[in-house]
């Protein structure tokens, strides 16, 4: 079973990210992934994330969003985690603005693996103590380490 810590890197874990709007956050996600993985085009990632949002918001409540999409040319899942400097409206189910985002990009053919990763993220973020730890992470490295620690039962 693939685990979140296997597809997330410290370089794709960011704190104090300027938000502004849902669209701007999705652009920043696309640019972040394309910067670290230049084989992917930021505009394509952005368009796929926007298309997925049009199907229904990935804002799940409690200030959390899990933007995700399938991506042509993607061979294995890619994740990122961002803590925004200020919450943004993400059309979340509970109406609350979002400040914590877990991103999941998967191959076009991904099915069960994609769903398993979404389950892992949702289960982790369902815990108030984990959300508090993530929100209080002072650095990108600390944010990444919290995800790893939680995945390892700490």
Swiss-Prot record:
Entry's Gene Ontology molecular function annotations: kinase activity; protein kinase activator activity; protein-N(PI)-phosphohistidine-sugar phosphotransferase activity
Record-linked SUPFAM superfamilies: Phoshotransferase/anion transport protein (SSF55804)
CDD domains given in the database record: PTS_IIA_fru
Annotated localization: Cytoplasm
Pfam families, A to Z: PTS_EIIA_2
GO CC entries: cytoplasm
Assigned keywords, A-Z: Cytoplasm, Kinase, Transferase
Major site of localization recorded for this protein: cytoplasm
Residues annotated as domain PTS EIIA type-2: 6-150
Cited PROSITE patterns: PTS_EIIA_TYPE_2, PTS_EIIA_TYPE_2_HIS
Superkingdom classification of source: Bacteria
GO biological process, one term: phosphoenolpyruvate-dependent sugar phosphotransferase system
Catalytic residue positions: 68
Keyword Iron: no
Domain notes: The PTS EIIA type-2 domain may serve a regulatory function, through its phosphorylation activity.
Function (record text): Seems to have a role in regulating nitrogen assimilation.
Identification of the protein by name: Nitrogen regulatory protein
Gene coding for it: ptsN
């Amino acid at each position: 079973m693939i685990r979140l810590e296997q597809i997330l890197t410290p370089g794709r874990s960011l704190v104090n990210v300027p938000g502004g709007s849902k669209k701007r956050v999705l652009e920043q996600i696309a640019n972040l992934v394309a910067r670290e993985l230049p084989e992917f085009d930021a505009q394509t990632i952005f368009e796929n994330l926007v298309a997925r949002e049009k199907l229904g918001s990935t804002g799940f409540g409690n200030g959390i969003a899990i933007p995700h999409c399938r991506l042509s040319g993607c061979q294995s899942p890619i994740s990122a985690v961002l803590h925004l400097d200020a919450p943004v409206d993400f059309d979340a189910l509970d109406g609350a603005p979002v400040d914590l985002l877990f991103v999941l990009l998967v191959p076009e053919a991904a099915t069960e693996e994609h769903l398993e990763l979404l389950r892992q993220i949702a289960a982790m973020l369902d815990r108030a103590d984990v959300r508090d730890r993530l929100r209080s992470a002072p650095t990108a490295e600390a944010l990444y380490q919290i995800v790893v620690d939680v995945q390892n039962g700490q």
